[in-house]
Regions:
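Long, ordered, helix-rich scaffold segments
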Residues: 1-276
């Protein structure tokens, strides 16, 4: 039993490392293509064994590992994983809430990323507004913010200040997820800088306010973004309650940028060598 538990732990660690490797590749580059191929070699056999839907013969470990493996497969753009998830969505689109919560977020993300339409976007947004199920709400949030459509990104950002769509307590997650999407990064980063006063009026003085700086630092990872972060936040260093957060989060981005700069070529060369 302990070896099974350690196997799950190993896989969790492995996919967590893989997740961090994404910082080392430029979007739409050969390095990114190589990383996706590498992730596919790590996950393809497991995807085939586990597939999307729970089975009677699943062990506890299978149930824990399935979402990790499928998430990796979708990042790798594994064709069979994508089409199987699309089929599950199509068969359940009138009853998405009844999908197994283990895979629902991934099924929805796959649909938005790879089979998107304005109708799908509006339909999920409407479900988000209406549902009282917090788990389903979160799954929709994760799906919509992974869109590859620039107009939809702008639409999402336009809802940041619409409390009828996005409740204030959910705004930070919407912001962070949009900022973490390569296509959404600029729009979300522009929004927080342009609307800082609005945000301060809305949540300033609240413990949650400084966490907007924390999640911003968690997503930004390039030299140019570091420069912009400093330019925007350094004049706010004397704001009561923000000083420590700004200093710490500047260091977070600085150390990440330095590490990427130092290791990028080694990491990408190593992945390329594994594939050769």
């Amino acid at each position: 039993k302990s070896s099974a538990a350690s196997d799950v732990y190993k896989r969790q660690t492995l996919y967590s490392i893989v997740n961090n490797l994404k910082f080392f590749v430029t979007p739409d580059s050969t390095d990114e293509t190589n990383l996706k191929k590498f992730v596919n070699t790590l996950s393809a056999d497991q995807v085939q064994r586990l597939s999307w839907l729970p089975k009677d013969i699943d062990s506890n470990d299978d149930q824990l590992v399935r979402p990790l493996v499928l998430n990796a497969a979708l990042y790798a753009e594994n064709p069979s994983a994508k089409s199987e998830a699309h089929e599950i969505f199509t068969q359940n689109q009138d009853k998405l809430l009844s999908l197994s919560s283990d895979i629902r977020a991934l099924v929805l993300q796959n649909e938005v990323k790879n089979y998107n339409s304005s109708q799908l976007f509006e339909s999920l947004l409407e479900d988000y507004r209406k549902t009282s199920d917090s788990s389903y709400k979160q799954d929709i949030l994760f799906a919509l913010t992974s869109t590859k459509d620039a107009d939809q990104i702008q639409q999402i950002v336009s809802y940041f200040e619409d409390a009828d769509t996005i409740k204030p307590q959910d705004l930070r997650t919407w912001y962070f997820r949009t900022l973490s999407n390569n296509l959404g990064e600029q729009a979300a980063w522009d929004w927080i800088r342009n609307e800082w006063q609005w945000l301060e009026d809305r949540v300033g003085g609240d413990m949650e306010f400084t966490s907007y700086i924390t999640v911003t630092a968690r997503a930004l990872h390039t030299e140019s973004r570091l420069v912009e972060f400093k330019k925007f936040f350094e004049p706010k260093l004397n704001t009561p309650g923000l000083t420590r957060e700004i200093i710490m989060d500047t260091k977070v981005i600085e150390s990440r940028v330095a590490m990427i700069e130092r290791e990028r070529d080694h990491v990408n060369a190593a992945i390329s060598n594994i594939l050769d």
